[in-house]
Amino acid sequence: MGIGVIDIDNHECMTLGSIQTSDCKTLDNMGKNLVDWYSNYLISRKDELQSIFRTVVADAFFSKETFITPMCESDFHVISRFRNDVVLYYPTLEKKTGKPGHPKWFDGRIDFANLDLTRCKEYEVNKGKLYGLRVYAKVLKRYVSLAVWYPMDGRTGKWQLYFSTDD
């Protein structure tokens, strides 16, 4: 596992350190899986890392509740990517009525082939369309900020879903 610091303005990355990932047998003996091991390692270095940054960027492998929740509880923010088949919901637009019971939590599942553009903010980007919105991610059991990118390179039905736990 490698930890690096990214300088976005200069398009550079500097390595802070690395550690050999434990093998499956060792992880099993510890009662952990790979996702648990990575989150525990980052959290164990929390004070050192948070003196430099609070945002962790991880690949789609880590877009799991068992990684995201411990990281957020340790005051880290996470940016990652969802798989294209992820289940996401629009937050409800209903207001409280004063009647007994809780209003519904969601207005429906998001269909990325037919995205409701009235709920999105569009951003100008090269070679595609980018939309931002707030969604509920079933896999993470939390609300996240979502960026949906539709590339304009001839690929139909191929969108990319990036999320952030930071509001």
Q: Where are the predicted features?
A:
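Active-site-proximal, Lys/Arg-enriched surface segment
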Residues: 1-15, 75, 129-134
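Active-site-proximal beta-strand elements of phosphoester/diester hydrolases
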Residues: 16, 146-147, 162-164
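An internal, acidic/charged active-site-proximal segment
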Residues: 20-149, 154
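Short, solvent-exposed loop/turn segments that connect beta-strands within catalytic domains
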Residues: 9-12, 153-157
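Extended, non-catalytic structural segments that build the interaction scaffolds
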Residues: 155-167
